[in-house]
A protein has these predicted regions:
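Structural core segment of the AMP-binding/adenylate-forming
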Residues: 2-80
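Alpha-helix capping and helix-loop boundary segments enriched in small/acidic/polar residues
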Residues: 6, 10, 94, 114-121
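Conserved pre-ATP/AMP-binding loop-to-beta segment of ANL
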Residues: 73-76, 83-105, 112
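Conserved AMP-binding A3 loop
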Residues: 101-125
């Protein structure tokens, strides 16, 4: 399962671009960004799950606003997601070197952000 990075500094347009291009199903973010998803998710219908960082304080009103705007979403803390994984164990599927690991979006300084495809072998080769 590849991960996709997106800079929150790119604003709604940059986020919509990366979500549309990758058809992401899940997004991880810090809780202060929850309401920043409301408008982009009107245009990008693939997101089904929102997981927020458990180590930061969350405003429950922000969760409610997002849920009200997009009732189809499952919104969880990272701790809740971890617990669900512990309760529903599956056999690991190790990636192959040629499998896509990450789509890393550029900052978009010269226009629309571009997604750089990194395979698992690229990430391993870059490790110290």
């Amino acid at each position: 399962m590849p991960i996709v990075t997106a800079y929150d500094t790119l604003g709604e347009e940059g986020l919509m671009h990366s979500l549309k291009q990758t058809h992401a199903k899940l997004i991880f973010l810090d809780p202060h960004l929850l309401t920043k998803l409301i408008n982009p998710l009107k245009e990008t219908k693939d997101i089904q799950y929102v997981v927020y960082n458990s180590q930061m304080e969350v405003n429950k009103d922000d969760i409610e606003k997002l849920k009200e705007a997009h009732p189809h979403l499952t919104i969880l803390s990272f701790d809740e997601l971890t617990k669900k994984g512990e309760e529903n164990m599956v056999e690991p599927v190790p990636p192959q070197p040629e499998d896509l690991c990450c789509i890393m979006y550029t900052s978009g300084s010269t226009g629309t952000p571009k997604g750089v495809l990194l395979k698992h072998k690229n990430v391993i080769a870059a490790s110290p």
